[in-house]
Design a protein with these regions (language model features):
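Phosphate/ribose-recognition catalytic cores of enzymes acting on nucleotide-derived substrates
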Residues: 2-200
């Protein structure tokens, strides 16, 4: 019997309201792997994204301790057109505009590990599809309007709903750990110097 086709995020968005997401359970949390994906990225990965950072909902840093950078709708179509909703991992880089009077520090313009949520964030009942990227670095200031480039290398887990904010935060922390572990493999590390990025 053929496996059921998994709808892409763009296909779900075309239907209107997304279907209800499954609720995360204790057994799911305890059974999560610490490394995901094959030994090297497989199609449709790598997926290259870029766009100017937009203001989002402002809750990633405030509510969850996980500040995110939002890409405009047109910038996420290379991913949403081929991938399901859920959490992904890879690398990202923030590039300041020429002459910007809000300069980033030297270690803030490097290519850095990231995790990304693609979906509707059911815990917050979003009404539209978004891609929210968390770069694993403590930036000293915001970078709205700066260019963000990302290379998406793999899938971590499906989009879930949560019984509490604490359960969501715990899963986010696990996502970050899984991403870092998964990116340690040689065939993933080489994408930190991908030609998509601005390398000195």
């Amino acid at each position: 019997m053929a496996a059921a086709k998994i709808e892409t995020a763009a296909e779900i968005a075309a239907h209107g309201a997304p279907p209800p997401a499954p609720v995360q359970t204790q057994s799911y949390r305890e059974s999560r792997p610490q490394i995901v994906g094959p030994e090297s990225p497989q199609p449709p990965f790598p997926i290259h994204l870029s766009g100017l950072v937009q203001r989002g909902f402002g809750r990633g840093g405030k509510d969850l301790g996980c500040p995110t950078a939002n890409l405009p709708d047109e910038s996420i179509s290379p991913l949403s057109s081929v991938a399901r909703t859920g959490v992904y991992y890879g690398y990202a880089q923030v590039i300041p505009p020429a002459g910007e009077d809000r300069p980033l520090l030297e270690d803030e313009v490097k290519v850095l590990p990231m995790v990304m949520s693609l979906g509707w964030n059911p815990f917050y009942h979003n009404e539209r599809l978004t891609a929210e990227i968390h770069i694993m670095h403590a930036f000293k200031s915001d970078f709205y309007g700066f260019e963000l480039r990302a290379v998406v290398l793999g899938y971590i887990r499906p989009e879930l709903d949560y019984v509490s904010r604490e359960a969501l935060i715990a899963d986010i922390e696990t996502d970050k750990s899984v991403a870092l572990n998964s990116l340690k493999r040689p065939d993933y590390q080489k994408f930190a110097v991908d030609s998509h990025f601005q390398l000195s």
